[in-house]
Amino acid sequence: CAEEMLSLIEGAEMVKFGKNGSDVTSAAVRLARAYTGRDLVAVCADHPFFSGDDWFIGSTPISAGIPKVTQELTVKFSYNPIESVQALFQQYSGRIACLILEPEKETAPVDGFLRKVQELCRKNGSVFILDEMIWGFRGHRGGGQRYHQIIPDLSTFGKALANGFSVSALVGKREIMRLGGLEHEQERVFLLSLTHGAETHSLAAAMEVIRIYKREPVIEMMWRAGGGFGKGGRESICEHSFPDHFKVFGKPCC
């Protein structure tokens, strides 16, 4: 399954499988903190959910039970205004371990936003993470990163990966990912340990999904079906005079 996964994602050199999205986004954050020796995590304020773990939930309105010191380790930026990202790196110079965002949500990147974010991460020594839970296996076979022609340091996948089976994946560059293994002399990272981690049905499902994606026009079908659904939705909204209450947004595939 690892070989099948890596064959799809350009620039990915290693993969670690989990069971849900929070498993792998939190693992990505741990790796980034270990790799950089920094504590702060920058998250996109316009993307609603990255993890059920403290590092993210502590930055939301439902943060009861999470220590203040943990909440203060997550900072936010806005999607598309590159000045928002620049301001964070200036305010927290040398302190940001990683930056995480989705390739896009209902708003597409403009003026080379994703590439500019990547350049800022490189310039400031921070790990660039793309959360592909929604875009992965929907917008492009190689994810939103392939669609937008950008290679992150780490990226996370799930949802459509196994067509509903419980599996997620963290993929990325070897120099970062290897810290979650045993073959290095640096301080070890406790990457993932899951109660049902040895369950293999979901991995078998993921393997078959990837094989189907390689031989069938699944992505094209989703774009067509989503386009038809969106068109019908907009027509129905106008027909019933609901434009102030409902709207259709985002890419047809998602």
Question: What do these predicted ranges mean?
Answer:
Residues 1-254:
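Conserved N-terminal phosphate-binding loop of PLP-dependent enzymes in the Aspartate aminotransferase
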